[in-house]
């Protein structure tokens, strides 16, 4: 799924990853709904990591397979969920025959994929119908993260790695998907999966090194000087009460993340009749 150097990154992140990156139950429920999941369906998780969401959705139904480029992550997945199928593979060369699955998902992985639309073409190839559901952030949304105030370089670099909504729609269309729609997702204070903007309503989370260690942007895209100065400013603003004014300046109605739901031609026609 990931570029080679990022596979190595996640091999180093793997141990202890699940301490802060647990599957969020509400997010898992939304993924299942957007997939239009069926108990007898066959589903693929692209960039499954330690398999938290693969396992969470498998408990709702279906036969699940996960792929990832990180050996360490997959070892964690196999250890915790031996009953599911795990494969070391790249998203631009999926090791499955055509029409193997009834649906697929990819959560917070778009910034690690090789040049689009090739991975999307591969996902479309292995689907016999159904939907491809992505959970991602758009650069337009990230510009409204209050993290930008404290870690501007990190957020700018992170945003450059993610396709815009229009570019993502175009890549999915080029890959053969139809009826692409977007549903915004707003971070709440009870989010269990502590990814990049999970601390939107809980800024003190970013002061915890264990939380930052399992967020790839902090691991690889935040230089040491910005990390030190940003954390110092955040801690100072939290003590003084100035943080609330900073957060208000970044308020947005765009949502913090988004579900991108792409139908196959077969799925669309089945809905039309």
Residues covered by each model-derived region:
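Short catalytic micro-motifs in class I SAM-dependent methyltransferases
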Residues: 108-112
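Short alpha-helix
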Residues: 160-176, 182
